[in-house]
């Protein structure tokens, strides 16, 4: 399966592999955060973010 798990449009039903890159993943089944310091469901993750540390929240999710 495509590791980026890209769908034609957001909300399209499909299955993501555990290795999907959620920054680009538009699948509803993908529940992972976009990066290690962002909580699942971070609304701004699609804009991209840079994590300073695994346990530190990035500015986009603050």
UniProtKB/Swiss-Prot annotation:
Keywords: Acetylation, Cadmium, Copper, Metal-binding, Metal-thiolate cluster, Phosphoprotein, Zinc
Coiled coil ranges: none
Binding site for a divalent metal cation 3: 16, 20, 25, 30
Residues holding a divalent metal cation 2: 7, 14, 16, 27
Positions of modified residues (Phosphoserine): 59
Binding site for a divalent metal cation 7: 51, 58, 60-61
Pfam families for the chain: Metallothio
Residue ranges, annotated region (Beta): 1-29
GO annotation terms (biological process): cellular response to cadmium ion; cellular response to copper ion; cellular response to vascular endothelial growth factor stimulus; cellular response to zinc ion; detoxification of copper ion; intracellular zinc ion homeostasis; monocyte activation; monocyte differentiation
UniProt binding sites for a divalent metal cation 5: 35, 37-38, 51
Domain of life of the organism encoding this protein: Eukaryota
Protein residues bound to a divalent metal cation 1: 5, 7, 22, 25
Chain positions recorded as a divalent metal cation 6 binding sites: 38, 42, 45, 61
PANTHER family per record: METALLOTHIONEIN, METALLOTHIONEIN-1G
Protein's name in the database: Metallothionein-1G
């Amino acid at each position: 399966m495509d590791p980026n798990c890209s769908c034609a449009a957001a909300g399209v039903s499909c299955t993501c592999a555990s290795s999907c890159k959620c920054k680009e993943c538009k699948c509803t089944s993908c529940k992972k955060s976009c990066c290690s310091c962002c909580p699942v469901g971070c609304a701004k993750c699609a804009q991209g973010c840079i994590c300073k540390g695994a346990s530190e929240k990035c500015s986009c999710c603050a």
